[in-house]
Amino acid sequence: MDLRQREHIETVVQATTYLAPPAVLADRIAHDAIIQNSWRRCVHQYGLDPSRMQEARILPQPRLREHQERIDDFARIARHGLQSLYGQVAGLGYVVLLTDAQGVTVDYIGEARSDAALRHAGLYLGAEWSESGAGTCAVGTALATGQALTVHQADHFDATHIPLTCTAAPLFDTHGNLHAILDISALTSPQAKDSQGLALQMVRIYAAHIENANFLRAHRRDWILKLNVAPEFVDVNPEYLLALDEAGRIVGHNHRARLMLEGELGGAPGATVLGQRFETLFDARLEDLGHYVYSRPSEQRLVALTRSGGLLYLSVLPPALRWQAPPAETQVAMPDALAALTGGDAALQLQLQRAARLVDSPINLLIHGETGSGKEFLAKALHLASARRGGPFVAVNCAAIPETLIESELFGHLPNSFSGAGPRGKRGLIQEADGGTLFLDEIGDMPRELQSRLLRVLAEGEVLPVGAARPVPVRLRVISATHHSLEQLVADGRFREDLYYRLNGARFTLPPLRARTDLDWLVRKLLQEGSAEGSEITLSPAARERLHRHRWPGNLRELRNVLEYARAVCADGYIDVPDLPDSLAGPAPSAALPQPGPAQSPAAAPFDPHQLPPEGMLLMQYLRASGWNLSAVARQIGVSRMTLYRRMERYGIQSPNRRDGGPEPTDA
């Protein structure tokens, strides 16, 4: 403890005892009433001891994430305000903090080279600055009083913090609740508190900007009234904001509007602005609001307050209409990567036509379909068809990564940032996808505590590795996929509703394989992909029928496995029913098992070669041309004689002599 800290402690002790008359204290203690009242709260209400110096408390990562998730929507809106404010003060040594209503720093922008000093001083992500915990400080005292203020150097209660200068302003939600604190602080500053006058003014201005941005987003479905004493600013920078429901009742306001209208209500006990009717507070009729839309000159939009008669300029925004889809445009050319996914199935073709319009759109895409229906194929095709094709395509199966590892796998981590973390740290998969496409398969299985962190990636274009205080910017396209009903997961509380709407910019539903009409094309395509160059795999009609009758619960993945198995076990490149896996090679579901006895009853229909499929008719032509010389035909078509026998039996082809009871067909 140095001399300055010892003297500060003595000053706080004197100010918080009631032994000396206030006039005497005023001569000795050059601190305003707000600071002295805060010191007294620290001692008499919170039980803090000024002689016990405590460094700033930094919350561990899991606790910090809980606080961030609770204020996540508001923090995303505030982020632009933080960045703009930091741009104004960065060269002066300040950092910008956003805290929640408990005083926990949930967002922070500062100079990277000063990280160690800022963390030690508590001007850092996760720092807890409540008045009951840290004593008199800008964040905590602004929370306690609801006022914007500067706590400069020796204004702080705890002598640990007396080198700091901190200026904070409260942020209120649209119902008047104190929701957050905006703060700019510096490790060092001039001795005079007056040097922070500009800082206080800027914090107030940006706090109002953030409040207004949050208001406009929260009440975009309501009537919004913008008011200002100057007509030039009523549209671009309104001082007062009100939201009305369809009945003309006030359902929201910014902080300045609340203070103004509480005065109009006369300060009656229990009187609140919320629920008041527009016509009670303003000398105008609800049905006349249309005269105040911003299309009229601002100087013609004057309205009077009922009680005081004060005049304000008014601009009215009607409720935002739901976006209407534009009329269908002419069909766009299908990129090759997408066209390669279908053989003409109408339902899939429709989905791909929609996808073709969105390959370079910035909106996020959600693919829904059964397991194995081709969700990753579609995501990869969208990537290859887009301008990001030169960047990475990173596929992540959220259900396959253990829950204990998914955070560090996705977001990465700094060296030794948690138990088991390596000394070198790790780039997360989100960073690996920078400049390309991130495909999140089975997104419905992502743990809920990580969903808010993914939301930040989508909203801000930046990722925060585990253990880091500074986010890393990323530029990527996010495509998600699931076989779950995300709507049901949202209803069950297992999936964040705001994340669902972020991911669901456009939705594609893939048909299951059993519903597709291009099975034959798929079979040919898959067999061709897996065959050696110059070789050809064909399918018997009976095997093809079995494929068509199968229900394909595993969809494309199951079909690929079936065909790979059949190709491996078939003879001479010809897949027949016995070559199929057991699940398909048994009797066809609707076919009766053959019974022992004569091969054909006298009443059976006569053999008709014109009813044969194309392969059978071609085989008949070879046999007839050779005079039914089976060995010659087998050599000609490149198969063994036994294979030729099987094919003839399959198509019901017999030598004319054999059908007439004559000799066997010749083999020589």
Swiss-Prot record:
Molecular functions per Gene Ontology: ATP binding; ATP hydrolysis activity; sequence-specific DNA binding
PROSITE patterns per record: SIGMA54_INTERACT_1, SIGMA54_INTERACT_2, SIGMA54_INTERACT_3, SIGMA54_INTERACT_4
GO BP, sorted A to Z: acetoin catabolic process; phosphorelay signal transduction system; regulation of DNA-templated transcription
Keyword list, A-Z: Acetoin catabolism, Activator, ATP-binding, DNA-binding, Nucleotide-binding, Transcription, Transcription regulation, Two-component regulatory system
Stretch list, region Disordered: 586-611
Disulfide bridges in this chain: none
Composition bias type Low complexity, residue spans: 586-606
Residues of the Sigma-54 factor interaction domain: 341-570
Binding-site positions, ATP: 369-376, 433-442
Domain of life: Bacteria
Pfam families listed in its UniProt record: GAF, HTH_8, Sigma54_activat
UniProt DNA-binding residue ranges: 630-649
PANTHER family reported in the protein's UniProt record: TRANSCRIPTIONAL REGULATORY PROTEIN
Functional summary from the UniProt entry: Required for sigma-54-dependent transcription of acoXABC.
Record's protein name: Acetoin catabolism regulatory protein
Organism: Cupriavidus necator (strain ATCC 17699 / DSM 428 / KCTC 22496 / NCIMB 10442 / H16 / Stanier 337) (Ralstonia eutropha)
